Design a protein with these regions (language model features):
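Intrinsic disorder at enzyme termini
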Residues: 1-10
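A structural signal for short hydrophobic beta-strand segments in well-ordered beta-sheet cores
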Residues: 140-143
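C-terminal helix-coil-helix/basic helical segment that borders enzyme active sites and/or dimer interfaces
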Residues: 26-38
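Residue-level signal for inorganic ion chemistry
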Residues: 11, 22, 74, 104, ...
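A short core secondary-structure module
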Residues: 148, 152-186
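A short, Trp-centered hydrophobic/proline-enriched beta-strand micro-motif
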Residues: 118-127, 169
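Internal helix-loop-helix
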Residues: 49-119, 160-166
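Conserved, non-catalytic sequence blocks in retroelement Pol enzymes and Pol-derived host proteins
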Residues: 38, 63, 131-133
Length: 186
């Protein structure tokens, strides 16, 4: 049997809506965003209201439950007009997934819907000067001091770091030899 790679009617409708939104709402403001280095919060919330942020996340957490292919289509459509704006979807999807799978349920129920609505803008701190985005080679250390962790080291290339409300930072909590198994998220 052959695999069917055709988009469903729902995927086509979402794709057309996202592409139209990108052309009509995002593309006209590209030069201004590029000059000011900032994405308008109203635009982000509008994307959230259309279900464009975290589309593959469960409906119970504010997503569309639409799957990764649909989410990828949305990201591609938004990137067509402005790659920087597409980071909102990309980071929202990554952070939403991490929280929905690894955070306490009450944290996921509180934070993920705000990400999907575009009310909370997020970033992920993984990349380091010495190892790029190789999670097994992270040097930034997290050491417990009583009830707190103290992070010591460097991160670089945190997309949208100057605009976000929340950031997850990946840091080493165990031996270097343990590679990715000794990495925690803060």
């Amino acid at each position: 049997p052959r695999m069917d790679f055709a988009l469903s009617d729902e995927q086509r409708a979402i794709h057309e809506t996202a592409l139209r939104f990108a052309s009509e709402r995002i593309a006209p403001g590209y030069a201004a965003r590029e000059q000011h280095g900032e994405i308008e919060r109203a635009l982000i919330e509008e994307m959230g209201s259309l279900g464009f942020i975290g589309a593959e996340l469960p409906e119970a957490l504010g997503g569309l439950g639409a799957g990764s292919v649909t989410s990828g289509l949305i990201i591609e459509d938004i990137a067509y007009a402005d790659m920087n704006v597409a980071y909102v979807q990309l980071l929202g999807s990554l952070m939403g997934w991490m929280l929905s799978v690894h955070a306490r349920a009450e944290v996921a129920r509180e934070v993920v819907p705000k990400i999907c609505q575009g009310k909370t803008l997020v970033a992920i701190g993984l990349t380091e000067p010495s190892g790029g985005s190789d999670a097994g080679n992270l040097k930034l250390r997290a050491e417990r001091h009583g009830d707190e962790y103290v992070l010591n080291g460097e991160k670089t290339s945190i997309s949208m770091a100057d605009q976000v409300d929340e950031t997850v930072i990946f840091a080493r909590t165990g031996a270097q030899e343990a590679r990715a198994k000794a990495i925690s998220a803060f």
